[in-house]
Structure formats: C-alpha cells, structure tokens
C-alpha cells in the first residue's frame, strides 16, 4: 500500500530576477477500497487486511446504511458507520465531511462492539465538523417516502430506512444540519432544527416529531462527540503533507449504487465511486494512489432494480444458500446471479482500478460449470456500453461464456499454487477480460483465507 510521498517535478529553476519558484509537493497518497458491483462484495475483509498496517482509515460517504462484517480472532464485529479499521488500536479512524451521521446509531454501534471487545475507540475516532447529521425525523421520513412510493407506483427503492436519502436531500436543498452547527450556538441550531422538522411535517401530515426530546438527546450527544470533532480539511491536509503515512479510504456501498453512475433510481444517495473520495474528504485527485475494486466471484443485489445475470433458478438458490446471502444492515435475502463482466468493466471505466480483490471464490466449488456474463445484446445487437435507462436494462440479453467448474474444496488454499487449475483459469479469465490484475482471492470468512497474489 502506497505510503510514499511524490513530488511534482516542475522544477524549481530560478525565474526572472533569480526568484526561486516554489515546488509543489504532492505529499502522501491514499489507498482506496471500493465496491465494484451492488455492494456486499467483501470490502470489509480487504480493508481489514490493509488496515492492519495503516496509520489512518477514512470513510468518505454514506452513513449507517453500509454494513461491514470483520472477523478477528473468531469474533465477528459489525460496522455500519465506523470505519472498520477502528479495530486497529494503532490507527486513527476518520469520518469525513461526505458521511451523514446518525449520532444515536454511532453510539449504539460502539456499545455493541465494545461488548465484543472493542476498546478506547473514542480516543482513535475523528469526525469532520462539516459532516451532516441524520436526525430521527429523517429516518421516519425515509420510511414514509417508501410507503408513498409503494402506494403510487407499486414499487419501492428498497431503502434501509436509515434516513440517508432524506439527509442528503436536506444537504442539497441547503437546509441540512452539520456537526459544526450542533457544536456552536445551540439556540441557533435548535431554531434551524425546528424549521427543518416543520418543513417535513408540512410534506407528511402523519409525521410526528418530538422536537424537545430530540433536541435534548442531540445536546447530550454534542458533549460526547465534542472531543472527537476537528476541521476535516486541515486534518486531511496535515495527514497528506506531514510525515510519510499509510492512509486508507474505505468506500461504502458500490459502483452500481452510485447516485450518478448506478442503476438509477435504485441507488443510494451518495457518490460511492472514486470521485466521492475527493469530495467526501476534501483532498485533491493527485493524492489518490492505488484504487482497489472488490468483486464477488458471482453477483448479488439487494432489493429491486435491473439485474441482467440474475438466476431465479437452482443455480441462484445454490449461490444464495452456500454464500449465506442476506444483508448485514437489513437481513434481507440477496438476489444472486453469475459474475457480470460488463458491470465490472463499467465500474473500472469510472474508478480506474489498479487491482482487484475477487472474493467468495469457494462458493463456486461445487458447480459443474460456471457461467460468466461477457457482453450485452439489445434487440440482437451487441452493445459496447452499460445502459443508463432501467427499462432498457430490463430488456438486455446477456452473452455468457461457460467455464468448467473445478469441483474441489478451495477453502484450505493459502497461495496461488494451492488453487485448482480450473479455478486459476477462472481468475485469469476475469483479469484478461477487464485488463486489471487480481491481487487477492477470497476463499473463506477469515483474514487468513484472503490469498495475496502479488
């Protein structure tokens, strides 16, 4: 992982009158881990590997709608809002300005993980003062909007009802409340809180808001988080331009859930592609180093929306059962299908992956043959792009390559040579098709079952 410093070699030759021009130093670079499908690819596991020797681990977007499970020494930790690097006692965890924070959720998550052995997290967590606050009424509105969508269109987005969408809506309409507002003049904050609550009540007549109760709770949380809050821009600038440091950015959600590039409208409300790293932390693009894409060896999706390689048959059921495919945040069953290299290529176009992590390869161990989606056809013609429109995406026919299964247990593999030849061929096929090397292969739940290839 790149903790190196780079300088821009526009050399400092003397200009007119012998004046020595300053030389721009790029500073440290951040390593980024992003989901390359519809989420649940196993990003937490890759982050966990890299977090062990990172100095700073950051979250740049999303909220507690994300769900990461990390297994350490047989204990399962569940993280939603915390960077999963919080379990590294030597690292600082940073929640950036692009994240939306539900304070009761933050402390509930801390309590649950403290019971499993997480210690001194409050000494290692830093929160950007520019991050927006998810209020309890944002969560209530999330549920009401979903009911409304169901009634009007007979379909819902499948939101986690964590208030993420309504909070980003408040942010975009410039009525949102930020951590810095909560920590300054509380009377001013209270007035703005009441205005926002009344705005939502005028839209949803059945929305009940205990204004005084919520403000009382927020005042209590304000004092609890005050020691953790910093100016995030200065914090990141110092981290990039101080001594050499390994900085890791943990993406939440995934490319196909991105508000701009995902399968809109069945997406989340933030940019979960690489651009969200710069806007969600306040760092320049030249400080982005390696970008690792995490992809499952098959494809899953939670909730409704187009899913070209979905298998509503025995193959899909087998993947769901063997892969234990239900959500960390919602407990909902995930829809399952074959690996789709069209969406992976599309995610690479946007993110510029420097390497991939291919997870859950072992789930395919029992299959006689494995299909891989390699191209889309629309009205019988191959198309060279990923369609933006949902109706068109529903009509797509997938062109498959059929590969022989390896029919043997890979869960004990710890290096490349331990993998069956046909499994190696599957990995090579993905690499060749996308033009990006696979750096890790996952064959089980534990940290040890991530095989590092280079």
From Swiss-Prot:
Can you tell me which residues bind IMP? 40-43, 65-68, 160, 174, 253, 268, 332
Location(s) in or outside the cell: Cytoplasm
Which residues of this UniProt protein bind GTP? Answer: 39-45, 67-69, 334, 360-362, 442-445
Q: List the disulfide bonds.
A: none
Cofactor(s) required for function per UniProt: Mg(2+)
Q: Which CDD domains match?
A: AdSS (cd03108)
Associated pathway:
Purine metabolism; AMP biosynthesis via de novo pathway; AMP from IMP: step 1/2
Provide the catalytic activity annotation: IMP + L-aspartate + GTP = N(6)-(1,2-dicarboxyethyl)-AMP + GDP + phosphate + 2 H(+)
Catalytic residues at: 40, 68
InterPro entries in the cross-refs = Adenylosuccin_syn_GTP-bd, Adenylosuccin_syn_Lys_AS, Adenylosuccinate_synth_dom1, Adenylosuccinate_synth_dom2, Adenylosuccinate_synth_dom3, Adenylosuccinate_synthetase, AdSS_1_vert, P-loop_NTPase
* Entry binding sites for substrate: 40, 328-334
- Provide the binding site for Mg(2+): 40, 67
Q: What's in the GO CC field? A: cytoplasm
Q: Which UniProt keywords apply?
A: Cytoplasm, GTP-binding, Ligase, Magnesium, Metal-binding, Nucleotide-binding, Purine biosynthesis
What the protein does comes down to:
Component of the purine nucleotide cycle (PNC), which interconverts IMP and AMP to regulate the nucleotide levels in various tissues, and which contributes to glycolysis and ammoniagenesis. Catalyzes the first committed step in the biosynthesis of AMP from IMP.
Q: How does it assemble?
A: Homodimer.
Protein name stated in the entry:
Adenylosuccinate synthetase isozyme 1 B
Q: Which source organism? A: Xenopus laevis (African clawed frog)
- Recall the taxonomic lineage recorded for the source organism: Eukaryota, Metazoa, Chordata, Craniata, Vertebrata
């Amino acid at each position: 992982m790149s903790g190196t410093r780079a300088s821009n070699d526009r050399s400092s030759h003397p200009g007119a009158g012998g004046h020595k021009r300053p030389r721009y130093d790029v500073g440290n670079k951040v390593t980024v881990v992003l989901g390359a499908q519809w989420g649940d690819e196993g990003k937490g596991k890759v982050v966990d590997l890299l977090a062990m020797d990172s100095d700073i681990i950051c979250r740049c977007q999303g909220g507690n709608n994300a769900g990461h499970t990390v297994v350490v020494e047989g204990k399962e930790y569940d993280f939603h809002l915390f960077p999963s690097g919080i379990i590294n006692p030597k690292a600082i965890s940073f929640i950036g300005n692009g994240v939306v924070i539900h304070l009761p959720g933050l402390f509930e998550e801390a309590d649950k993980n403290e019971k499993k052995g997480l210690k001194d997290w409050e000494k290692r967590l830093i929160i950007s003062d520019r991050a927006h606050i998810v209020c309890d009424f944002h969560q209530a509105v999330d549920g009401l909007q979903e009911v409304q969508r169901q009634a009007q269109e007979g379909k819902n987005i499948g939101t986690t009802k964590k208030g993420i969408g309504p909070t980003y809506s408040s942010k975009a309409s410039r009525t949102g409340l930020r951590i810095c507002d909560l920590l300054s003049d509380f009377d001013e904050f209270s007035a703005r809180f009441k205005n926002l609550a009344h705005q939502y009540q005028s839209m949803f007549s059945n929305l009940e808001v205990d204004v005084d109760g919520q403000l009382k709770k927020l005042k209590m949380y304000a004092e609890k988080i005050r020691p953790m809050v910093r100016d995030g821009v200065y914090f990141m600038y110092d981290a990039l331009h101080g001594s050499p440091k390994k900085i890791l950015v943990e993406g939440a959600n995934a490319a196909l859930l991105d508000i701009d590039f995902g399968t809109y409208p069945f997406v989340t409300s933030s940019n979960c592609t690489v651009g969200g790293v710069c806007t969600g932390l306040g760092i320049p693009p030249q400080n982005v180093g390696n970008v690792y894409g995490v992809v499952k060896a098959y494809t899953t999706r939670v909730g409704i929306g187009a899913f070209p390689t979905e298998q509503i048959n025995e193959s899909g059921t087998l993947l769901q059962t063997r892969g234990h495919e239900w959500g960390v945040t919602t407990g909902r069953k995930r829809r399952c299908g074959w690996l789709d290299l069209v969406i992976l290529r599309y995610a690479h176009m946007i993110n510029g992956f420097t390497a991939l992590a291919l997870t859950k390869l072992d789930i395919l161990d029992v299959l006689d043959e494995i299909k891989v989606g390699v191209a889309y056809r629309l009205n019988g013609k191959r198309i060279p792009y990923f369609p933006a429109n949902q109706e068109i995406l529903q009509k797509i026919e997938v062109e498959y390559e059929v590969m022989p299964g390896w029919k043997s247990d890979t869960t004990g593999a710890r290096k490349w040579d331990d993998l069956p030849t046909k499994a190696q061929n599957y990995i090579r096929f993905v690499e060749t098709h996308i033009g990006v090397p696979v750096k890790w292969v996952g064959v089980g739940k534990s940290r040890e079952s991530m095989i590092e290839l280079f």
